[in-house]
Design a protein with these regions (language model features):
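N-terminal polybasic phosphate/anion-binding patch
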Residues: 2-68
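Anionic-ligand binding patches
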Residues: 42-168
Length: 168
């Protein structure tokens, strides 16, 4: 059995992280911890990646080496690429041997006129206000993609380096 310690109690993130690991490792036990990211409530750019890293570092203060196979930190936020804003999920995984890998979900565009509102609250709050609590990315993609999908994609992307340690 693969033991994964996850630095979130957000149920929307736990299930897809578990599913991402199960896809490659079979039987997985995910233990969850309420660990703070130490970044702003709505992280931007490097803060998104730092939040995932910080969660792992905080988790290492709680769990002992040998009690896990992998540690997982997750954070969602905004990133600016080439002058355009995107909402993303970031997953960082650290193996027991210390090897780390970070994956990122597909990014969905955030209109410039909403960036300031989002920075002052969150993507979820702004989207829920705009679309009357209909589910954020699920609503924007006409039920094609959910936050669960984004977290699972980021998890699988982070696992690429872990799974291919000898060549990647």
């Amino acid at each position: 059995m693969t033991i994964v310690k996850v630095a979130t109690k957000n149920i929307i993130k736990i299930k897809p992280i578990d599913e991402g690991f199960e896809k490659y490792f079979g039987n997985v036990l995910c233990d969850v911890y309420d660990v703070k990211s130490e970044v702003p409530a709505q992280p931007i750019n490097e803060e998104v990646f730092q939040g995932a890293e910080n969660r792992i570092e905080k988790l290492k203060q709680i769990v002992k080496k040998g009690e896990y196979d992998y540690l997982v930190g997750c954070e969602d936020g905004l990133i600016n690429l080439c002058g355009k804003w995107f909402g993303v999920q970031v997953i960082t995984i650290e193996a027991q041997n210390g090897k780390k890998s970070t994956g990122i979900s597909p990014g969905y565009p955030i209109p410039e006129e909403y960036v300031r509102k989002i920075v002052n609250s969150s993507v979820d709050d702004v989207v829920d206000d705009l679309f009357e609590d209909k589910g954020g990315i699920k609503y924007l993609t006409k039920n094609e993609v959910t936050k669960v999908d984004l977290v699972k994609n980021a998890t699988v992307m982070a696992l690429t380096r872990i799974l291919n340690n000898d060549i990647w």
